Amino acid sequence: MDNDFILVLDLGGPQAVEMARKLRNQRYYTEIMSRGADEELFRRKAPRGILVVGGDGYSEPFPKAALALGVPVLALGGAARRMIETCGAVSEGILLKEQASQITFKPCPLFDQLSESDRYFARVDGFALPEGFVSIATTLEGFSPAYADLERRLYGLQFYAESNDPDGAVILSNFAEKICGCTPIWTAKDFLEEEVRYIRERVGNGSALMAVSGGVDSTTCALLMHRAIGERVTCVFVDTGLLRSGEAEQVRNTFEGELGLKLISVDAGDRMLNRLRGVIEPTEKRQVIYEEYMKILAEVGREHPEAEYFVEGTIYSDLLARGSSDAVYARRFDPGKRLEPIRMLFKDEVRILGELLGLPRALAARQSFPGPGLAVRCMGEVTESKLALLRRADAIFREEIQLAGQDKKLTRYFAILDDTRTVGRRLGVTTREYACVLRAVGEQGLASYTVGKLPYDMLERAAARIIREVPGINRVTYDISPCENTFVEWQ
């Protein structure tokens, strides 16, 4: 993309991903950088402009390196307050908090095509503006939620472009194109053509192994590699024994049959369960599974010395969650021989790319599944008997969701097996069996989701079926914990 892009600087919070995706949806390429970056890194990246977001509730100062680069800067939310204070403004306290007000935009290239609208403000502070800055918008009460140094092209808005917000989309587009001079050229089709060329140049006449799970990310990446180098890529599927009901067979059938890709399948169920014996803590579970998985990939790599490259289906959210550009890879492979073709794509972009590559519709709609699999949905020690209960309960819940047509409203829905045993009754006999928890969410971003408001009669049917058809579970609950306090997964 050369330097025709906007750098999104994350000061903390979920907004960086949301704003970056909004710009990409308008075909402007973006990259995200975490707070703490130095001026030299900014200069190496050489973006056309910098969007600084987040910082609400965080104590980190505004990065002066962003101001020193000499390119346009747009700061949103808490970052706007940090920027103006860094430039010498004096705070006059909070003027508005958690309320809506009408906003009028003054003549400014950032607000071309806009005049006034109603907007929700989480917080608006008053400032005695420093030299060079002027107010560029006012609320109905006469407050200034936006200001700018037009000569230095520094803009601060104490609000965000919210969901389904046409004015916010216009502001971001104006910043990218009219102020920064970016061109809206980012599309999945252009990415596909460019990445195929890059892979062919990088791999040359070599061959590659690629770890696949059957999910959207790794399958799309495998199809991309196959488009680039054909039969010289071999997929490696490790059946950890921690997949949902019927998934291992589905993965093998899809890759070898429907997609016609070369596949090495490794049955590692017993091996993984042996390593997990006695492990209860979630962090330790993840570490054990990761270590064993990487050992298996390294073994496959040693058995295929002709494969010079190792490929992973890492996507952008994986990269951001790690806080590093270094991805995991099989230890036999030198880092210079590692490929992550879709590492700069968000999940929705991966799905679009998959469709271009012929990804089966059923796979394109497949919900996200954690890397450690059912181990993180099985509370306490993971055993084969507990996994069997969880698989059956999960399959019933997913079937009821789909029969009720609720799957189109949700991004993830699954069962969790609690380690608690409760008193119940089965065939007139008192029992002590496991409790099962159902979870359904609609994700809106990297750290934001809504709890699925499922019809009560559907939940009743699912609960009744699970208790009746899965001996070993005698109690079913539905988790409605909000994202402000919990994660989607329990572990």
What annotation goes with each model-predicted range?
Residues 322-323:
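Short, solvent-exposed loop/turn and secondary-structure capping segments
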Residues 316-318, 444:
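Short loop/turn segments at secondary-structure transitions that flank enzyme active sites
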Residues 1-52, 56-62, 67-69, 85-308, ...:
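RNA-binding accessory domains that recognize and position tRNA/RNA substrates
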